[in-house]
Amino acid sequence: MRYRYLGRTGVQVSEYMLGTMSYGSDGNTDERECVDIVHRALDRGINFIDTADTYSHGEAETIVGKAISGRRDKVVLATKFRLSAGDGHNDQGGSRYWIMKQVENSLRRLKTDHIDLYQMHRPDLETDLEETLGALSDLVTQGKVRYLGCSTAPAWYLAETQAVSRLQKLSRFVNETSPYSIFQRAVERETLPAVQHYRMGFTAWSPLNGGWLTGKYSSNSSAPTGSRADRVQGQWGKHYPILQSRFDMQRPGNRQKLELLPELESIARQAGLSLMHMAQAFPLAHAAVTSVILGPRTIEQFVGMEAGFETKLNHPTLDQIDALISPGTLIEEADRGYVSPWLVPASRRHAATGSG
């Protein structure tokens, strides 16, 4: 396993980060297997773990807490806050009220006295950044949190957070987590340049594009049983409705993916790689990327990913990928991750008045 610095924190983290979104009732309900995946990842050299308060309604944090018991000092532990995690009006967001409450819930579930990287799970545009960063800075001062970050934020928001932190002398975000894959290269336009400018870390989520780049899908077959495309038809899809669009085969972008897959598989074969290993290594070829999040749901999936940990793409392979899918390209809009609230139909014209 190779390691990279997390921005300018001086902390070294593994090039691959273990994602736990599929742990618990929204994914793998076999707690023992989930714990075994964590142990296997740690044994393989992964020292960076990603989870969130909303993954399986907090169950993922609980499982991670059990899994790292006795090995906590070997782990750079990241979790998130911001998305709705309760029935109350204030059980979400970037307010001091919610941050101070939810960090205690996460610490309890994770069975730890501190979180290494506490990330805001998408921007909260209804709350002043001074409010959010002030509360988070207090957590750093208290020792409950070591570093701060955000997830799936646009470049302008990253710039604003850095400015507010500097002007108000508050702790800064040291990491951004966004979707980045061969099919989702939009972050190459503005997000990754911003990350490099501010010397932040960058962790890439969905490097396999939700399973599209594993070789599971083709235009000639239905989604394999247990795959994300299959599971979004059930309760999991209801909990994460955007995932239904990501696997809607009638959408033009998804149809284009089906057309591109054979060509990508050909590029991988020429490089002596599987499509999955080429895809999981792809984000690491960008200088701004710190770590790539892999979220195996089963031991079998982890074993498949593990075999590609040492893969490093060469220039000819990267050139072939660029020729097929240009830098900065987003194939399917549903994969973007962050959607401006002003583009959501329900709020697009909420301030409009009159009948003209």
What is each of the regions a protein language model found here?
Residues 187-239, 274:
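Aromatic-lined glycan-binding groove of carbohydrate-active enzymes
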Residues 81-83, 154, 180-184, 206-217, ...:
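Glycine-rich beta-alpha junction loops
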Residues 6, 18, 34, 49, ...:
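Conserved, mostly hydrophobic/aromatic
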Residues 8-26, 78-91, 114, 119:
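N-terminal small/glycine-rich loop or linker at the start of catalytic domains
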Residues 1-75:
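N-terminal binding-site loop/beta-alpha segment at the start of enzyme catalytic domains
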Residues 11-16, 45-47, 71-75, 112-116, ...:
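Short, well-ordered coil/turn segments that N-cap beta-strands
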Residues 221-266, 270, 285-290, 299, ...:
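Terminal-tail/helix-coil boundary detector
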Residues 26-27, 39, 43, 86-190, ...:
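Glycine/proline-rich, positively charged
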